[in-house]
């Protein structure tokens, strides 16, 4: 599933084609994805101007001129693709239609935004902009890891006394929003913390030290366009490249990259997810 860096990369890719532009025509090609689309969604989107695109955790919000926001979740395999527009150095022509093209937005200026989702775990909804943060998908979320509200004191307080593994705590969207399996593995490796260690056992210094590492990993991943392991593509259809710099994720059986360490990357399963770690470096 796309995590914060992938969603932020897609948001940035959509912005030139959508922000400030009118939705000339919206087409909805089925009744639902993970959940039913809101009633008359195509009609309600057509003629609306996109005021801005923003991200909350793993969700994109397109604020519209009529006072509503289009809430977008990519799910497992969803892609928001831009065509008919100049993106960077290249013009991206419209691709042939696919049976997995579920929502199409024809934008003022000739760009087309296509929501393609083969597995249909994605979602779209319309919500009043002023009440967007109260939407059931957003209301439970913790602070943004790149925002000012997420600091060492906050994280230390939230981890204190917790008897869940530190990995599970960082994946808890109520504690910090947007982190997923890949980036938590990478953060814990850089921090030298074992994924199975109890969150409440961290010293205050260890807990506070996670914050700059979380930001470091996320910003590096955004700069690389995210991580493409299976379905993820940027808005222009290009792959992300952060997977080429993974230090631990997906490297089971390979030597640890820490200078002077003789360890081998191992894999354990926690709550159905693979956790990659160095048993020598991470304690």
UniProtKB/Swiss-Prot annotation:
Keyword DNA-binding: yes
Enzyme active site: 2-3, 58, 273
EC number from the UniProt entry: 3.2.2.23, 4.2.99.18
Protein name in UniProt: Formamidopyrimidine-DNA glycosylase
Zinc finger annotations (FPG-type) as residue ranges: 247-283
GO molecular function: 8-oxo-7,8-dihydroguanine DNA N-glycosylase activity; class I DNA-(apurinic or apyrimidinic site) endonuclease activity; damaged DNA binding; zinc ion binding
Catalyzed reactions: Hydrolysis of DNA containing ring-opened 7-methylguanine residues, releasing 2,6-diamino-4-hydroxy-5-(N-methyl)formamidopyrimidine; 2'-deoxyribonucleotide-(2'-deoxyribose 5'-phosphate)-2'-deoxyribonucleotide-DNA = a 3'-end 2'-deoxyribonucleotide-(2,3-dehydro-2,3-deoxyribose 5'-phosphate)-DNA + a 5'-end 5'-phospho-2'-deoxyribonucleoside-DNA + H(+)
Organism this protein belongs to: Cereibacter sphaeroides (strain ATCC 17023 / DSM 158 / JCM 6121 / CCUG 31486 / LMG 2827 / NBRC 12203 / NCIMB 8253 / ATH 2.4.1.) (Rhodobacter sphaeroides)
Cofactor (UniProt): Zn(2+)
Function: Involved in base excision repair of DNA damaged by oxidation or by mutagenic agents. Acts as a DNA glycosylase that recognizes and removes damaged bases. Has a preference for oxidized purines, such as 7,8-dihydro-8-oxoguanine (8-oxoG). Has AP (apurinic/apyrimidinic) lyase activity and introduces nicks in the DNA strand. Cleaves the DNA backbone by beta-delta elimination to generate a single-strand break at the site of the removed base with both 3'- and 5'-phosphates.
Gene behind the chain: mutM
Record's keyword annotation contains Hydrolase: yes
Cofactor binding annotation: Binds 1 zinc ion per subunit.
CDD domains: EcFpg-like_N
Positions bound to DNA: 100, 119, 162
PROSITE patterns documented for this protein: FPG_CAT, ZF_FPG_2
